[in-house]
Amino acid sequence: MKAVIVIPARLKSTRLPEKMLVDLDGKPLVVRTYEQAKKSRLASDVLLAVDSKRLLDIAESFGCKAVLTPENLQSGTDRIAFAAKSIDADVVINVQGDEPLIPPEMIDSAILPFIENAALPCATLIQPIVSDVPEILQNPNVVKVVTDKNGYALYFSRSPIPYQRNSDAQPKIFRHIGLYAFRKPALETFTTLPPSMLEETERLEQLRLLENGIRIKCVITNLDSQAVDTADDLAKVKAILAKKLK
């Protein structure tokens, strides 16, 4: 089985302008993400899927493999699907371009289920929510997930799930980590499906898979990463990276 990591990277970003090119100790943020992904033991290769010639040229100047994709694609998943057409891969892993500290072990944990199950269409990562702080459970930016007994997703929501009507019950509550792995046919199928009702309601594209009967294996991880969405996130990453590079 051949697994390839594809990292979607857009030059334009709203909260942190051109964040993919922000300097992190002499290298652009997206290059740091690429280098972390290269440390995966189970992936055969890594490819950047970029939306501009400028980003392509900069990535290649640092030795990154990259492919230019149309600027107007609707989502990161559409971008990796476009890039995946040109690569030889059985499984395609979507690692976000703004994850310069992502542990390679997180990536490998999403690949492993495909080795164990040749029919698996899709996998993603989830993490236990160990705090009952309302600011976490009620935060719509923290996506919650419930699974069946075999670890397959039943539903993803921005609302707290499951709703705890029985105060004696002690359900495990999980948050979704936005790293996906697709068997290539499932990825191709996803991009041909129209946006679904639940997807548009919650603004969560993974619900398109569930509504169309495509199962998602949820892998529990206790590892952490730090995405860069804001200036505060960037400051955290710079501080962590400075310690690592000492």
Swiss-Prot record:
Similarity comment text for this entry: Belongs to the KdsB family.
Protein keywords: Cytoplasm, Lipopolysaccharide biosynthesis, Nucleotidyltransferase, Transferase
Molecular function terms, GO-annotated: 3-deoxy-manno-octulosonate cytidylyltransferase activity
Gene designation: kdsB
InterPro entries: Cytidylyl_trans (IPR003329), KdsB (IPR004528), Nucleotide-diphossugar_trans (IPR029044)
Stored Gene3D superfamilies: Spore Coat Polysaccharide Biosynthesis Protein SpsA, Chain A
Principal localisation: cytoplasm
A Gene Ontology cellular-component term: cytosol
SUPFAM superfamilies recorded: Nucleotide-diphospho-sugar transferases (SSF53448)
Phylogenetic classification of the source organism: Bacteria, Pseudomonadati, Chlorobiota, Chlorobiia, Chlorobiales
GO biological process, one term: CMP-keto-3-deoxy-D-manno-octulosonic acid biosynthetic process
Signal peptide: none
Protein name according to UniProt: 3-deoxy-manno-octulosonate cytidylyltransferase
Intracellular or extracellular location(s): Cytoplasm
Protein source organism: Chloroherpeton thalassium (strain ATCC 35110 / GB-78)
